[in-house]
């Protein structure tokens, strides 16, 4: 469950290390984002030689949340951290590698490139 001012780790090799959520996309009153949702973020920490610089405003898709998500079959899934993958304007990942597992809900949100790059889909 991601909302404004939530800090997230970056799960790709774009050069950013930490993001802060600015806005949850999908309606004017939408407060929370979960797995597979697109958010607007500010880069808070970045590597000096990366593609993404500190202070940039980027779009990202949430791939891991600490708050558990209930699946259709009744099972719950949660992760150890909040993490996101940075997207470009065509909703494709900027990085070429994805680190750590991603939730299956990312596939249902039609981010197939992220699913194919991920080492594990839970």
Swiss-Prot record:
InterPro entries for the chain: Ribosomal_uL14, Ribosomal_uL14_bac-type, Ribosomal_uL14_CS, Ribosomal_uL14_sf
One Pfam entry name: Ribosomal_L14
GO biological process terms on file: translation
Keyword rRNA-binding attributed: yes
Annotated GO MF terms: large ribosomal subunit rRNA binding; structural constituent of ribosome
The organism's place on the tree of life at top rank: Bacteria
PROSITE patterns listed in its UniProt record: RIBOSOMAL_L14
Gene3D superfamilies linked to this entry: Ribosomal protein L14 (2.40.150.20)
One cellular-component annotation, GO: cytosolic large ribosomal subunit
UniProt KW keywords: Ribonucleoprotein, Ribosomal protein, RNA-binding, rRNA-binding
Keyword Ribosomal protein applies: yes
Family indicated by similarity: Belongs to the universal ribosomal protein uL14 family.
Protein's job: Binds to 23S rRNA. Forms part of two intersubunit bridges in the 70S ribosome.
HAMAP family: Ribosomal_uL14
Quaternary structure and interacting proteins, as annotated: Part of the 50S ribosomal subunit. Forms a cluster with proteins L3 and L19. In the 70S ribosome, L14 and L19 interact and together make contacts with the 16S rRNA in bridges B5 and B8.
Protein name per UniProt: Large ribosomal subunit protein uL14
The species this protein was found in: Campylobacter curvus (strain 525.92)
Organism classification: Bacteria, Pseudomonadati, Campylobacterota, Epsilonproteobacteria, Campylobacterales
């Amino acid at each position: 469950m991601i909302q404004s001012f939530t800090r997230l780790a970056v799960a790709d090799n774009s050069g950013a290390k930490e993001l802060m959520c600015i806005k949850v996309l999908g309606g004017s009153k939408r407060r929370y984002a979960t797995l597979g949702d697109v958010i607007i973020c500010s880069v808070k920490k970045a590597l000096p030689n990366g593609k993404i610089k500190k202070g940039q405003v980027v779009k990202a898709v949430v791939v891991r949340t600490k708050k558990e998500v209930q699946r259709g079959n009744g099972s719950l899934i949660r992760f150890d951290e909040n993490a996101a993958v940075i997207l470009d304007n065509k909703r494709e990942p900027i990085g070429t590698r994805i680190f750590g597992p991603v939730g299956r809900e990312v596939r249902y949100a039609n981010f197939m490139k992220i699913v194919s790059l991920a080492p594990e889909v839970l």
